[in-house]
UniProtKB/Swiss-Prot annotation:
GO terms for molecular function: glycine hydroxymethyltransferase activity; pyridoxal phosphate binding. Its EC number is 2.1.2.1. Its cofactor is pyridoxal 5'-phosphate. The gene is glyA. This is Serine hydroxymethyltransferase. It comes from the Bacteria. The lineage of its organism: Bacteria, Pseudomonadati, Dictyoglomota, Dictyoglomia, Dictyoglomales. The keyword Cytoplasm applies. It comes from Dictyoglomus turgidum (strain DSM 6724 / Z-1310). It catalyses: (6R)-5,10-methylene-5,6,7,8-tetrahydrofolate + glycine + H2O = (6S)-5,6,7,8-tetrahydrofolate + L-serine.
Length: 414
């Protein structure tokens, strides 16, 4: 950085501190990842200067020749990755993408069936504190109490009873494969629209490691970060018949000017996602998650649903004498970043929780593999078994720093 230290030393110091945290801490938050230098460069480019309300070839401002090219490239790439008929890459976030779909198919008060947030869903799938729960009449399906997996017969029975206008599938904390074909059959049976929020698994879907929702859903939304390893942002895929309505819902419906520098960064991430290396990376994410899950089970931890099929796992801490909130704090003090997370049928409030969510995308980006995952699982166990012992946390923190030195993120490129 050449100019920031002089112009704004406070922000410069905060950024440098965050760089250090990312380099020397173990990032296990399932929704986080490390973008490439190319993505960072695109997002920090002069495209941030350009206003471009509208769509390529139909802008409300002049001077859009080059940003049109950028957006066209991004749209074509993401359509190619997922085999979609239409794509909108303008949503600023996954929440905005979901809002746009809701605005297309729903009126205030319409019935929607989505996954319970407490069972692994997402705020925008009908939480009463979110716009989705305030505007629409959401009902919820969850996981089976015994298997802790989605029971599709129960979903079908709920759908038959409620006759929702829209069914939403997708999750933020569900460690198993989701059967989108079954959901589509349920939606068809009750005459509902079907939307999938694949934000967490978009990278796995791109690599063919999770069944794609695109052939089955009327609408698919996603973020571009998480497993897709792009900038923070969103996109929508849909059938051609909904293309005009979706585009109108995004602009002028819920957004004004698109963030062209972010769309450029999305395009770069999409190109990276089309490479053979990306597929291998996604395979390793899953291998790493399975290795860590197996090691945690060996160490005596109960995982929700008994394991994982994807990039994340939920650890039930109820028999360990520690809450999710306490675990998150203790691990952070030892240089390991996770997030407290509700488990299905959690007796604790969402601000405390009985579990933690662990994900492997970011550490896999660093080049870590199964052996490192097993080692990290043991470090997690050491901290959680002694979460009030400052000496243990300090010891683990040093071990974490030594491990991080072997797998640099951006230091090797400086």
């Amino acid at each position: 950085m050449r100019y920031l230290p002089e112009v704004d030393p406070e922000i410069y110091e905060a950024i440098k501190s965050e760089e250090y945290r990312e380099e020397y801490h173990l990032e296990l938050i399932a929704s986080e990842n490390f973008v490439s230098r190319a993505v960072l460069e695109a997002q920090g480019s002069v495209l941030t200067n350009k206003y471009a309300e509208g769509y390529p070839g139909k802008r409300y401002y002049g001077g859009c020749l080059y940003v049109d090219k950028v957006e066209d490239i991004a749209r074509e790439r993401v359509k190619a990755i997922y085999g979609a008929e239409h794509a909108n890459v303008q949503p600023h976030s996954g929440s905005q993408a979901n809002m746009a779909v809701y605005f297309v198919v729903l009126n205030p008060g319409d019935r929607v069936l989505g996954m319970n947030l407490a069972h692994g869903g997402h705020l925008t799938h009908g939480s009463p504190v979110n716009f989705s729960g305030k505007l629409y009449n959401f009902y919820f399906y969850g996981v089976d109490k015994n298997t802790e997996m989605i029971n599709y017969d129960s979903v079908w029975n709920l759908a038959k009873e409620l006759k929702p206008k829209l069914i939403v599938a997708g999750a933020s904390a569900y460690p198993r494969i989701i059967d989108f074909e079954k959901f589509a059959q349920i939606a068809e049976d009750v005459g509902a629209y079907f939307m999938v929020d694949m934000a967490h698994i978009a990278g796995l879907v791109a690599a063919g490691l999770h069944p794609s929702p695109v052939p089955y859903a009327h609408f698919v939304t996603s973020t571009t970060h998480k497993t897709l390893r792009g900038p923070r942002g969103g996109f929508i895929l849909c059938k051609k018949e909904f293309a005009k309505e979706i585009d109108k819902a995004v602009f002028p419906g819920i957004q004004g000017g698109p963030l062209m520098h972010v769309i450029a960064a999305k395009a770069v991430a999409f190109k990276e996602a089309m490479s053979p290396e990306f597929k291998e990376y996604q395979k390793q994410i899953v291998l790493n998650a399975k290795a860590m899950a197996e090691e945690l089970i060996k160490l005596g931890y109960r995982l929700v649903s008994g394991g994982t099929d994807n990039h994340l796992m939920l650890v039930d801490l109820r028999d360990k004498g520690i809450t999710g909130k306490e675990a998150e704090k203790a691990l952070e003090e030892a240089g390991i970043t996770v997030n407290k997370n509700a488990i299905p049928f959690d007796p604790q409030p969402p601000t405390i929780t009985s579990g933690i969510r662990i994900g492997t995308p970011a550490l896999t980006t660093r080049g870590m593999k199964e052996d490192e995952m097993r080692y990290i699982a043991r470090l997690i166990h050491e901290v959680l078994s002694n979460f009030k012992d400052e000496r243990v946390k300090e010891k683990v923190k040093k071990e974490v720093e030594e491990l991080c030195k072997q797998f640099p993120i951006y230091r090797k490129e400086n």
